[in-house]
Amino acid sequence: AHPHSSDQVSVVHNGIIENSTILKKFLEKKGYVFKSQTDTEVIAHLVSEYLKKNSLKNTIIKVLKKLHGSFALGIIFKGQTDLMVGAKRGSPLAVGYGPNENYLGSDSYALKSMTNKISYLEDGEFCIVKKDQIEFFDTDGSNINKKVMNLSKDELNYDKGDYKYFMEKEIDEQPTTINDCINEYIDKYNNQINIYNFPWKISTIKSVMLIGCGTAFHSCLIAKYWMEQNTNLDISVDIASEFRYRKVRFKKDCLYIFVSQSGETADTYAALDLCKNNNMKTCAVVNVIESSIARDADLVLPIYCGQEVGVASTKAFIGQMLVLYILSTKISFDQKILTKDEYKAKLKNLLYLSSLAKKTLNIDQKILKIGKVFAEAKGSMFLGRGYSFPIALEGALKLKELAYVHAEGYPAGEMKHGPLALIEDGMRVVVIAPRDQH
């Protein structure tokens, strides 16, 4: 468990040091004895080693150049109660400002109970933090200035209220967050979508690639069906952790859309960075507008869901789908595929979404009864066709995340090509069948 220590140095670390094995051998030759298998201990010993002959600032510069991979570091020193060091590459790191005290944390959510003023470090940057002073440095050790952000009251005051769990609260918030999102993007009086600062002409975009991880990937899959149906663009979807390691053939006329609730998903951020390095058009669909992905993308489309604490995404999943649907509708209308009447009808239908969500949540007692049946299951299978297939994948993911039971999502038409062999006593099946062709 963190922190990991070496002599006078203690380190907490979020990320992965990819060359930890090589560094460990180097340090063992220097006489360091490792007490764990974690890559974090490598960092602690490395700092101790370089501190023998270097100033603190030069030590951090040398250590960061040795480390390969992603990390957010917090480092403290024995006997020095007024000193911390933070460093960032790939993983998020924020600095909080307080009266006669300062803080390090992964993001605004970690710091909100202590301060409403923060700064985010960018890749390669580090900081030396004292209670009344913070110095920021770039990779080479040159001093830099950082923008100070003020957190909103909503971010500072989010709690469970009368709910037992944050996730339960966030499920019930969905009708409200749907309305909030619609109000931000749809002008109800003029019947039009408002996406401000759209930096490209629609005619310059010939294809779209949607990229995400986990639940965000599922929202991308659903958006693929909508965009294929509503636009004349070529649409593709990729998992961020696969995209970043493939030989990608970048296209100048492609819009790359990155979906992430936190805006800090490491693989998604790495995929965005890859696109930025190749001068591609990039768009971020995020919940946290101060996040790394939001700061680096050309266009940011917030989902306006408010803070989501639950590990299993609920209201953010709805928000991601809603924003991607709105974007799909805007592109379709701008391409003159939708008539004005069809465009207005789609926007009008969206206005019913909040009340329909509320109606769905009112069947919670039925859901509780069904939940007891699934609690006794050997496994579960979720089936869907068309845009219901990604919903099936999401249902299976939720059951795995929350109940720790085996679940799989399949296209309904593939049932006969293998999965049917799993159907037996104790296997539960959920079929997603809305009142349309799917």
Q: Can you annotate each of these PLM segments?
A:
Residues 203-352, 385, 432-438:
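Glycine-rich phosphate-binding loops that contact phosphosugars or nucleotide phosphates
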Residues 89-92, 101, 120, 223-229, ...:
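Short, solvent-exposed amphipathic alpha-helical segments in soluble enzyme
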Residues 1-160, 164-165, 176-183, 187-206, ...:
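Conserved short alpha-helical segments that host acidic/polar catalytic motifs at enzyme active sites
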